[in-house]
From Swiss-Prot:
Organism in which the protein naturally occurs: Escherichia coli (strain 55989 / EAEC)
Lineage: Bacteria, Pseudomonadati, Pseudomonadota, Gammaproteobacteria, Enterobacterales
GO cellular component, one term: cytosol
Gene Ontology molecular function: 1,4-alpha-oligoglucan phosphorylase activity; thymidine phosphorylase activity
Protein family per UniProt: Belongs to the thymidine/pyrimidine-nucleoside phosphorylase family.
Protein name, as recorded: Thymidine phosphorylase
EC numbers: 2.4.2.4
The reaction(s) this protein catalyses: thymidine + phosphate = 2-deoxy-alpha-D-ribose 1-phosphate + thymine
């Protein structure tokens, strides 16, 4: 039997906690036998004293085990259970293509996703712009879709890692969110509850990233790879660029439109293609569906070219109560904004810098994201035809096309876009889309 205050004292004094102590504390968070003050105190001691790798693994596993852990054995699936998690960005619509592409190559992707957070868009919000799309199928239906289609993207239910929800709420109001061991456990508790064989992490770097510096993004990626492999799940991470909007669009319906166009081959933004392919390659190799980069890329290109990936996306939408002909007729189903008009730079020049975070916040301000959990979303608003770093802009080539609910909203968004995009006399050096791959 342990005492919560003794566990806090031990960590306060800079000592490592045992697996049993960590499990006792996390179970107490779940059962409400540990107070909010005690959660706050432990979070702050971890913030200042960090955790050893064994402590980080124990914390993650205890949080995972605080709720249901999915088990796929009874379905006798003939492929690996794999998933991807992104730290979030703007125009980061990779999940919508990646899930179907990997499923078309023989993987099974039970993706439990999130809503928008701060300036970053949420995969669930994007999918809810599809009429009828059900992000909360019951457990049996979720399993059926995984077995039949190969991929489902759903919201987090209360039975998955419940201790994380309470722990996170306390961290949020006590300035202890940005602690690498706590972020790692929070992300992985939910992902590892999916019962995965392999995981790839997309850790963003740059002006639209969750972590403020390259070094911190790298430290988070290394921590996640270390802990997840320590917990028995083959995991790699890619550090990818978020110094500009990843897709050509940012919003909800506009990003779903771009995802469908990507899958059908109608339009593929080169940077979005690079990042999506790189993540899919990791999933295929870690999931043992391909032996190397070349084989993985060939398989992925084939399912894009032969229409299989687009077909899987359509089947997922239909299985989750969306329209059965969505891929063919997406334009008919997706909501459109009242006012669609381009915004131009005041001078001509080359796009040299982008405050990606500010562009994400501009989408939120237009109604495309939430400032608080109770807000409703306008799925139709956002940006399309975004200029990219190095593009020449003038009176002919706009900075973006703004999809707004009215003229006032358009004016505010136009101001935000102009302020967020800097121009120079010459094009900047091009930056890579993938900076580094991190494996165990």
């Amino acid at each position: 039997m342990f005492l919560a205050q003794e566990i806090i004292r031990k960590k306060r004094d800079g000592h490592a906690l045992s697996d049993e102590e960590i499990r006792f504390f996390i179970n107490g968070i779940r059962d409400n036998t540990i107070s909010e003050g005690q959660i706050a105190a432990l979070a702050m001691t971890i913030f200042f004293h960090d955790m050893t790798m064994p402590e980080r693994v124990s914390l993650t596993m205890a949080m995972r085990d605080s709720g249901t852990v999915l088990d796929w054995k009874s379905l006798h699936l003939n492929g690996p259970i794999v998933d991807k998690h992104s730290t979030g960005g703007v125009g980061d619509v990779t999940s919508l293509m990646l899930g179907p592409m990997v499923a078309a190559c023989g993987g099974y992707i039970p993706m439990i996703s999130g809503r928008g957070l701060g300036h970053t868009g949420g995969t669930l919000d994007k999918l809810e712009s599809i009429p009828g799309f059900d992000i909360f199928p019951d457990d049996n239906r979720f399993r059926e879709i995984i077995k039949d289609v190969g991929v489902a993207i759903i919201g987090q239910t209360s039975s998955l890692a419940p201790a994380d929800k309470r722990f996170y709420a306390t961290r949020d109001i006590t300035a202890t969110v940005d602690s690498i061991p706590l972020i790692t456990a929070s992300i992985l508790a939910k992902k590892l509850a999916e019962g995965l064989d392999a995981l790839v992490m997309d850790v963003k770097v740059g002006s639209g990233a969750f972590m403020p510096t390259y070094e911190l993004s790298e430290a988070l990626a290394e921590a996640i790879v270390g802990v997840a492999n320590g917990a028995g799940v083959r995991t790699t991470a890619l550090l990818t660029d978020m110094n500009q909007v990843l897709a050509s669009s940012a919003g909800n319906a506009v990003e779903v439109r771009e995802a469908v166009q990507f899958l059908t081959g109608e339009y593929r933004n080169p940077r979005l293609f690079d990042v999506t392919m790189a993540l899919c390659v990791e999933m295929l190799i870690s999931g043992k569906l391909a032996k190397d980069d070349a084989e993985a890329r060939a398989k992925l290109q084939a399912v894009l070219d032969n229409g299989k990936a687009a077909e899987v996306f359509g089947r997922m939408v239909a299985a989750q109560k969306g329209p059965t002909d969505f891929v063919e007729n997406y334009a008919k189903y997706l909501p459109t904004a009242m006012l669609t008009k381009a915004v131009y730079a005041d001078t001509e020049g080359f796009v040299s810098e982008m405050d990606t975070r500010a562009l994400g916040m501009a989408v939120v301000a237009m109604g495309g994201g939430r400032r608080q959990a109770s807000d409703t979303i306008d799925y139709s608003v956002g940006f399309t035809d975004m200029a990219r770093l190095g593009d020449q802009v003038d009176g002919q080539r706009p900075l973006a096309v703004i999809h707004a609910k009215d003229e006032n909203s358009w004016q505010d968004a136009a101001k935000a876009v102009k302020a967020a995009i800097k121009l120079a006399d010459k094009a900047p050096e091009s930056t890579p889309t993938v900076y580094r791959r991190i494996s165990e």
